[in-house]
Design a protein with these regions (language model features):
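Glycine-rich phosphate-binding loop and adjacent beta-alpha segment
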Residues: 130-195
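Adenosine-nucleotide cofactor-binding segment
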Residues: 68-134
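C-terminal capping/lid region of NAD(P)-dependent oxidoreductase domains
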Residues: 120, 189-207
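NAD(P)H dinucleotide-binding glycine-rich loop of Rossmann-like/cofactor-binding domains
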Residues: 1-49
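Glycine-rich NAD(P) Rossmann-fold beta1-alpha1 loop
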Residues: 34, 54-61, 65
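Receiver (REC) domain switch-region micro-motif
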Residues: 50, 124-126, 149
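Residues at the starts of beta-strands that form the adenosine-phosphate
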Residues: 49, 74-77, 148, 173
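Glycine-rich helix-loop-beta junction characteristic of Rossmann-like nucleotide cofactor-binding loops
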Residues: 40-46, 118-120, 141
Length: 207
């Protein structure tokens, strides 16, 4: 619903200006998930193995792009998808070193897949972007001890994540879905300016 009006914000309230160099719907589609790529930039380091669950979705594509920038040529970005369409989409973008469809796979099967792809090292960072329930154990099992799991998905159950990790003796650090980090709005809009392929896909899907 489009309106003309005024918003009264608390002093601590966050807001972002719509930029002049892109359509409003395109900007809003990116701002909706702006925290994910900005947090990815903080979490990922050169040479790491990074697993992104839901890599072909809106937040997943942005995270894959940022993760590859951060891990460089010696790191590895593994994109995990659920549908044929999202699998092909992220493959075409070329941000991931490996793309695998895990639709119908159990967490243990995904663990074995990631183990094979990383030579047994597992992921330093796992980012869950898929907005469906019961992905907690998949993310935990992909990640090495002392690694980081970032649950960006709002479908995450804290109970399942915490008790599941404890139950299998996994010493991972878990970040639960904080979609805000300083400068996240401009950071994410800049990704669309930097990457023409990403901007084209976002325009076609969301704008």
């Amino acid at each position: 619903v489009d309106i003309k009006g005024k918003a009264i914000l608390f002093e601590s309230g966050i807001y972002a200006k719509i930029p002049d160099d892109m359509p409003e719907k395109l900007a809003l589609s990116a701002l909706d998930v702006a925290g994910a790529p900005a947090q990815t930039a903080k979490l990922c380091q050169y040479g790491q193995n990074v697993v992104i669950i839901g890599a072909g979705g809106k937040s997943g594509m942005l995270c894959c792009y940022e993760a590859k920038k951060r891990v460089g040529v010696t790191g590895k970005v593994i994109g995990l998808t659920n549908s044929q369409r999202s699998t092909q989409r992220i493959k075409d973008l070329g941000f991931c070193d490996v793309v695998e469809s895990i639709g119908g796979m159990t967490p243990v099967q995904v663990n074995e897949l990631v183990s094979n792809l990383t030579g047994g090292k597992m992921a330093d960072v796992t980012i869950n972007c898929v907005n469906v329930p019961d992905q907690e154990m998949t993310a935990v099992l992909c990640t090495k001890d002392d690694g980081v799991v970032y649950f960006f998905s709002m479908a995450t159950s804290f109970t399942k994540a915490a008790l599941g990790a404890e139950g299998i003796g996994s010493d991972v650090n878990m970040i639960i879905g904080n979609g805000y980090t300083k400068g996240h709005a401009e950071f994410t809009l800049q990704e669309l300016r930097e990457c023409e392929e990403l901007r084209k896909i976002f325009t076609g899907l969301y704008a």
